[in-house]
Amino acid sequence: MKFALCNEVLQHLSLEDGFAKIAEIGYQGVEIAPFTLKENPLEIDESDADRCIEAAKSAGIEIVGLHWLMAKTEGLHLTHPDEDMRNAACEYLKKLTNLTSQMGGKIMVLGSPQQRNLEPGTPYEVAFERA
């Protein structure tokens, strides 16, 4: 069994130093929170993925995937009545899926309860259809 740590807990360090610390304290892998890469997670791109790959290689740890996928984003929600908001969330998750794959990760932890909770008054069945 491998153990991984979300890099959010070390976001006060540079990405490279954080990954090195994760390895130093005995973890074999890292889950990356997108908001630790850019202030606006919607702006993450392939160069950010490349930086993560290099930092993980240097530290000798594996990128297991992404975590807190929709945290610190605005205008994204999985079950909101606004179709544009749902579509934007879908496109963002597709982008993160590609970046996870590029980094060699296999796990995506949604977390981010505000973007997946039901809007007040929305029946579960309606929210399920929207998602």
Feature locations, PLM:
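Boundary/entry segment of secreted carbohydrate-active catalytic domains
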Residues: 1-13
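Active-site-proximal loop/turn and secondary-structure-junction residues that shape catalytic pockets
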Residues: 9-11, 34-36, 69-72, 114-116
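Active-site acidic/histidine proton-transfer and metal-coordination neighborhood
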Residues: 16-17, 57-58, 62, 75-131
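Generic structural signal for well-ordered alpha-helices
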Residues: 19-22, 46-54, 93-97
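Glycine-rich, proline-tolerant flexible connector loops at the mouths of alpha/beta enzymes
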Residues: 33-57, 112-119
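Conserved beta-strand positions in the central sheet of alpha/beta enzyme cores
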Residues: 31, 65-67, 109
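Catalytic domains of carbohydrate-active enzymes, especially glycoside hydrolases
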Residues: 16-35, 103-104
